[in-house]
């Protein structure tokens, strides 16, 4: 059975970087997908599907549920390894419920943990505005993305706490410390 780890955190929390390092250092057993990267790859392809996605991403808005869930389920189904890390998902109660429904309806993938990388809004803002990753890294879009992240957060935390799969990590430390803690946690659950 494949084991799924979801990593959530504010924009700029470091969730993608943390997951990339862990997957790179454990390439024999762990594969990582970033929801944002999966969607950005589709946009970069220039497809009609990509243009639809871009009309949401460029404004900092959530991509429609069916597109995101389809993208995630497709990535899980085609994952070449048995341990899968997906960061940036879920970002809404609807995304959470849709994935939960899909996972309950099958027996190939087990959600092992949802890891929340915690950072303050000021640290997140400083990090995002200090990087130049894309057109979506400006103050207005950051503020929108932060609201989009914070609005459903308590409900997402409660949902996964009840399932006993929520694990919080302090994201305001040196990246080596964060990665070390996250990697130990994941390996302990493999």
UniProtKB/Swiss-Prot annotation:
Q: Which Pfam families match?
A: ADK (PF00406)
Ranges that cross the membrane: none
Keywords associated with the record: ATP-binding, Cytoplasm, Kinase, Nucleotide biosynthesis, Nucleotide-binding, Transferase
Q: In which pathway does it act?
A: Purine metabolism; AMP biosynthesis via salvage pathway; AMP from ADP: step 1/1
**Where is the protein found, in the record's own terms?**
Cytoplasm
Q: What is its EC number?
A: 2.7.4.3
Cross-referenced CDD domains: ADK (cd01428)
Q: Name the family the entry cites.
A: Belongs to the adenylate kinase family.
**Family matches, as NCBIfam families:** PRK00279.2-2 (NF001384)
Question: PANTHER family of this UniProt entry?
Answer: NUCLEOTIDE KINASE
HAMAP family documented for this protein: Adenylate_kinase_Adk
Name of this chain's protein: Adenylate kinase
Write down the species.
Helicobacter hepaticus (strain ATCC 51449 / 3B1)
């Amino acid at each position: 059975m494949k084991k799924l780890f979801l990593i959530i955190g504010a924009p700029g929390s470091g969730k993608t970087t943390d997951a990339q390092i862990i997957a790179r250092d454990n390439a024999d057993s762990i594969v990582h997908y970033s929801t944002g990267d999966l969607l950005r790859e589709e946009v970069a392809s220039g497809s009609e599907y990509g243009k639809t996605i871009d009309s949401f991403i460029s404004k900092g808005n959530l991509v429609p549920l069916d597109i995101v869930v389809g993208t995630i389920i497709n990535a899980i189904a085609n994952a070449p390894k048995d341990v899968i890390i997906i960061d940036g998902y879920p970002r809404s109660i609807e995304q959470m419920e849709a994935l939960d429904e899909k996972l309950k309806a099958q027996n190939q993938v087990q959600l092992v943990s949802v890891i929340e990388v915690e950072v303050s809004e000021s640290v997140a803002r400083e990090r995002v505005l200090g990087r130049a990753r894309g057109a979506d890294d400006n103050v207005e879009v950051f503020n929108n993305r932060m609201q989009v992240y914070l609005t459903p957060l308590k409900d997402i935390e409660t949902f996964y706490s009840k399932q006993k799969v929520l694990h919080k990590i302090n994201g305001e430390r040196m990246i080596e410390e964060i990665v070390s803690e996250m990697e130990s946690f994941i390996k302990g659950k493999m």
